[in-house]
């Protein structure tokens, strides 16, 4: 039911903002064609978090140096779950999603344990989405609709450029 998914997603996004530091035990996996507004919408959410929000790619996910995740409350993984060979990364991703502590390993510094408050959203445009177990409760997979009229996205980007992320935060 699209309405139930919409309401679940809004609550999933609101909960960490209303309860700073809470670690959700699920990640959102947005899947759908290019041009459906995934980056635009979640970019606005990331803007609310300011320096505590981050975006990462496949290379950063696979790197032994994960300092990019240090201190983050919200993370966007752009196209990090779209390759069939990503199966070997599933354990790492599960830990990122559910563990309350994680090791942070920055280059030329000793590794350290840090509280994990980072709630994750992953994007994929491709059909060969990550291998998920049918009973895996860690992901909410949301299939986006086909792209809307381009004017909708232009209007949204204009609104965001005019303080829309701050308005969204107070909505």
Predicted regions and their residues:
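P-loop NTPase catalytic core of nucleic-acid-dependent motor ATPases
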Residues: 1-77, 140-144, 168-171
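Short helix/loop capping segments that flank catalytic or ligand/cofactor-binding pockets
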Residues: 39, 84-86, 130-132, 150
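Short secondary-structure boundary/capping segments
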Residues: 48, 92-93, 135-138, 156-157
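Conserved nucleotide-sensing/catalytic segment adjacent to the nucleotide-binding pocket
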Residues: 54, 66-119
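Short, polar loop motifs at secondary-structure junctions
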Residues: 125-128
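A short helix-turn-beta junction within AAA+ P-loop NTPase domains corresponding to the substrate/partner-engaging
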Residues: 130-149
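Conserved phosphate-binding loops in nucleotide/dinucleotide-binding enzymes
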Residues: 150-161
């Amino acid at each position: 039911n699209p309405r139930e998914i919409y309401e679940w997603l809004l609550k999933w996004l609101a909960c960490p903002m209303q309860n700073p530091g809470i670690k959700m035990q699920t990640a959102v996996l947005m899947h759908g064609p290019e041009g459906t507004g995934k980056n635009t919408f979640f970019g606005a959410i990331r803007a609310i978090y300011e320096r505590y929000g981050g975006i990462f790619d496949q290379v950063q996910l696979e790197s032994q140096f994960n300092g990019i995740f240090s201190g983050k409350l919200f993370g966007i993984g752009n196209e990090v779950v779209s390759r069939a060979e990503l199966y070997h990364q599933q354990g790492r991703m599960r830990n990122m999603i559910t563990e309350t502590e994680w090791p942070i390993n920055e280059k030329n510094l000793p590794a350290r344990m840090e509280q994990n408050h980072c709630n994750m959203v992953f994007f994929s445009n491709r059909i060969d989405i990550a291998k998920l177990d049918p009973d895996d409760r860690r992901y909410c997979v949301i299939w986006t609709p086909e792209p809307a009229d381009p004017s909708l996205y232009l209007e949204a980007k204009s609104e965001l450029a005019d303080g829309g992320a701050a308005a969204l935060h107070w909505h």
